[in-house]
Amino acid sequence: MPVLGSQRRLLGSLNCTPPATLPLTLAPNRTGPQCLEVSIPDGLFLSLGLVSLVENVLVVAAIAKNRNLHSPMYYFICCLAMSDLLVSVSNVLETAVMLLLEAGVLATRAAVVQQLDNVIDVLICSSMVSSLCFLGAIAVDRYISIFYALRYHSVVTLPRAWRIIAAIWVASILTSVLSITYYNHTVVLLCLVGFFIAMLALMAVLYVHMLARACQHARGIARLQKRQRPIHQGFGLKGAATLTILLGVFFLCWGPFFLHLSLIVLCPQHPTCGCIFKNFNLFLALIICNAIVDPLIYAFRSQELRKTLQEVLQCSW
């Protein structure tokens, strides 16, 4: 696996290899004495990966076990868990191999290690793309269920959901292979950043519109019950808090990584940008944290899923 300065995490090639279409080079030692670098120990990476691995395996197992959860919405949540599971597996695998190599327990040729690193890079990149796609799919599914409630079951059918899921996985794998193969082209980085911005905008527009509709519905109920002010304010605050958490977690966990990719194109030699480049490991750790938080936001809030999860933990299959 490529060792580039202090950064030895997945997608390291995107971190320090400049785009070939522009004469860009990253200057590793021009960040100045006040540059803050957050060191992420391998043990922490391994711990985060294992926690995420256990969480998302439980989500997949619970949805697979309970037939009441075999619906398009839960299939999207299950696929999101599988995407996060790939992030966890890739992280655990890479960290374990790195620790074994550093300890001298595992001895292999550099070419083999490089091939393993390429495979892991494809896994992590495809999991990132698919995770973003399924987050968007969940938002669209919820939007349709609110604004087209009467037509929901005719619009979001199981065959259609399966086709969407298959298309997302195929597109994610192709995108990851192309991204890793042509990582040194500016257009690849810009496409990845543009994809993130598009998904962020899609989720923000849909969830804000859903919140506005929910508040409007709450006001209507309040007027009928002649208790407009207390109900509306309480519901609006709760909805705004939920929306802030949902979009805030998404932006905080994914934003720094895609900011990093943007700066590789915009200012690869600027000292300030160099400070940001030095924290690449931190940005990847935040993505793993997102894989831990996703089940808490999208899966474990379901009472039916929590009940099934208890049965899974008790091994009562």
Curated annotation (Swiss-Prot):
Glycans are attached at N29. PROSITE patterns: G_PROTEIN_RECEP_F1_1, G_PROTEIN_RECEP_F1_2. Gene3D superfamilies: Rhodopsin 7-helix transmembrane proteins. It is found in: Cell membrane. One of its GO terms (molecular function) is melanocyte-stimulating hormone receptor activity. A lipid is attached at C315 (S-palmitoyl cysteine). Coiled coil: none annotated. Its main location: membrane. Pfam families: 7tm_1. Disulfide bonds: none annotated. It is a multi-pass membrane protein. Residues 64-72, 141-163, 212-240, 301-317 are cytoplasmic. One of its GO terms (cellular component) is plasma membrane. Interacts with MGRN1, but does not undergo MGRN1-mediated ubiquitination; this interaction competes with GNAS-binding and thus inhibits agonist-induced cAMP production. Interacts with OPN3; the interaction results in a decrease in MC1R-mediated cAMP signaling and ultimately a decrease in melanin production in melanocytes. Receptor for MSH (alpha, beta and gamma) and ACTH. The activity of this receptor is mediated by G proteins which activate adenylate cyclase. Mediates melanogenesis, the production of eumelanin (black/brown) and phaeomelanin (red/yellow), via regulation of cAMP signaling in melanocytes. This is Melanocyte-stimulating hormone receptor. It comes from Ovis aries. The lineage of its organism: Eukaryota, Metazoa, Chordata, Craniata, Vertebrata. The gene is MC1R.
